[in-house]
Amino acid sequence: MTEVLYGLDAAERARVAALRAEGRFFWLDTSLSETSREDLVDTLGIPERALSALRTAPHGYASRAFHADGESVVFALRCYAELEPVEEQAGYRLRPMEVQVLVTSDYLLTLHDERVSLPAVLAPDLPPGRSKGYVVYSVLDAMLATTSDALDEVELKLDTLVAAWTEGDGGGVPRATLRQAGARLATMRRWVRNEQAIFERVGLETGALRDFGTSEEPYFDRLEDQVDRLLTSIDAAANAMGMVLDLQLNERAYVLSVVATIFVPLTFITGFFGMNFGWMVDQVDSAVAFWLLGFVIPIATAALLWRLLVRPFIKGDPR
């Protein structure tokens, strides 16, 4: 069974040395906030070319951080975990974290800045007796699964907004929430598209590593298919958000058109009062008549029209 290690304290270093002496493949996950790259080199004997690739900042274009030299494969991915909340992603439980991955014939290394145990977050299925290629596939598959979970979070947020909007009083959808969802989907799509290019090479390059062989099942082809499905799902979620915006804009245009029709009779009313102003002054000979004709009757008429005609027209006939 593949052994999984987290961190690089004295006990873990001794265990790594023992596993390497026995020729057993293992997965080591560690945080750069707890371990230095020099410690990794001393413990794992990372090749110089792979170390240079690991030193490349994973931010920006993840596909540019890809490195393969026949002895190691280095690339950067993104997964989602429950991390400390940040202001621009308030309301979401899962936060993105960038992970640098190093695959050699002896071990799998995952490196990140956050103090979090990736094996505990991903909990991949690593049954005994499976090949090295399957171990790498299982870890990468679990990382992609967290992206699916994060996408589900966005879709559930949109579903909640639509339900609250349709079942409530027709109030507008919060713009801040839509902006957060749109930004999250855009960032997610950019990273998944980069990962699509990465996974097209990972299967080929890892197959060239010692003891990985070429007779493996097409595990990495499954990852490519999964990335394609993720891109399709992200685009569908973005389209759904666009539909929410369209519905909200249509409702606002609908209300504005109704309000605009209310002002159409004003031309007739002002013209009538202007042409008959002298007659009205002669007829209004008491304070009661002034209040009735000037305030009570117009207000009552407007309220009645609103209640019987305008409001049902805006809200829709419940029958």
What are these regions (language model features)?
Residues 122, 205, 247, 254, ...:
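Residue-level signature of transmembrane alpha-helix interfaces in integral membrane proteins
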Residues 83-91, 209-214, 281:
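Short helix-coil transition/hinge motifs at the ends and kinks of transmembrane helices
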Residues 106, 143, 169-273:
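Membrane-associated alpha-helical segments
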Residues 57, 69, 125, 168-169, ...:
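Surface-exposed loop/turn and secondary-structure junction residues enriched for glycine/proline
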Residues 266-319:
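Alpha-helical transmembrane anchor segments
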Residues 1-204, 222, 311-319:
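Peripheral, non-transmembrane regulatory/ligand-interaction domains of membrane transport proteins
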Residues 140, 147, 230, 298-306:
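Alpha-helical transmembrane segments
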Residues 62, 204, 210-211, 280-282:
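A short hydrophobic/aromatic micro-motif that marks alpha-helical segments and, especially, helix-coil
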